[in-house]
């Protein structure tokens, strides 16, 4: 059930209630490039499961500090709709009007699929590694209302995340990500470097580059400072146009470039 401030509003605008997507929330940039939004008006079947295994220490896979392997899978599909005579044009119907659906009825469209395998390993006391492979099927036509080079985006994504902490007060982290697809805007690559000092000051630089369609750099750099429950951040960068999902709420964000200043406090 969807409640809007205006019955005629479409897309992701005007919602009064909110239903978060039943899919994994990704924190890495490229796995989160095509975020899924719950299809409240059309309805959906959604399934998600996760399996994790910890390799013990002093084993070939576990090594000295142990290794964690996680497999997460999400599958979201349309509902079967048996239309009732007398309700007019099917395309003009809204919400749950004009059709019946059996409880375990599946339609013809897949909305979203996400299968990802993540490896977390502490190599030494100072070095740790996270590696991930992800396959994603994203129905751009359903979620965004349009498709680029096809309605369905099939993506293969690789992520490498290395952390190095030489002392208690200094730590560094680097990310390298790659997304391959023949749909939408094609291939992407992303890099990030973070430097944390005294557990309160952090500096970062990042760049997300589109290899195929626009050949554009979306760079960003900034500094943040944490003190007790306060956090202040200043950043400069370029943001691509597209859907931005935060806390499960997705909204369209226009392209921008400039300085951002943010302040957060926890009560």
What residues fall within each predicted segment?
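Exposed, low-structure sequence patches enriched in small/polar residues
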Residues: 1-267
């Amino acid at each position: 059930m969807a409640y809007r401030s205006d019955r005629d509003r479409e897309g992701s605008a005007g919602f009064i209630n909110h239903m978060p997507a039943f899919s994994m929330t990704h924190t890495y940039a490229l796995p989160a490039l095509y975020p899924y939004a719950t299809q409240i008006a059309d309805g959906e079947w959604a399934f998600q499961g996760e399996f994790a295994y910890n390799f013990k220490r002093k084993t070939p896979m576990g090594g000295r500090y142990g290794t964690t392997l996680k497999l997460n899978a999400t599958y979201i599909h349309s509902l079967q709709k048996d239309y009732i005579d007398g309700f007019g044009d099917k395309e003009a119907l809204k919400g749950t009007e004009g059709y019946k659906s059996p409880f375990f009825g599946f339609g013809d469209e897949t909305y979203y699929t996400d299968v990802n395998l993540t490896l977390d390993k502490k190599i030494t006391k100072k070095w740790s590694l996270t590696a991930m492979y992800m396959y994603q099927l994203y129905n751009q036509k359903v979620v965004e209302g349009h498709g680029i080079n096809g309605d369905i985006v099939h993506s293969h994504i690789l992520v490498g995340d290395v952390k190095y902490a030489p002392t208690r007060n200094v730590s560094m982290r680097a990310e390298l990500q790659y997304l391959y697809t023949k749909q939408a805007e094609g291939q992407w690559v992303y890099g990030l470097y973070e430097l944390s000092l005294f557990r309160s000051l952090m500096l970062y630089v990042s760049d997300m580059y589109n290899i195929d369609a626009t050949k554009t750099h979306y760079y960003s750099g900034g500094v943040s400072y944490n003190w007790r429950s306060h956090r202040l951040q200043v950043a400069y960068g370029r943001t691509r146009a597209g859907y931005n999902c935060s806390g499960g709420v997705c909204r369209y964000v226009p392209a921008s470039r400039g300085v951002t200043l943010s302040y957060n406090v926890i009560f």
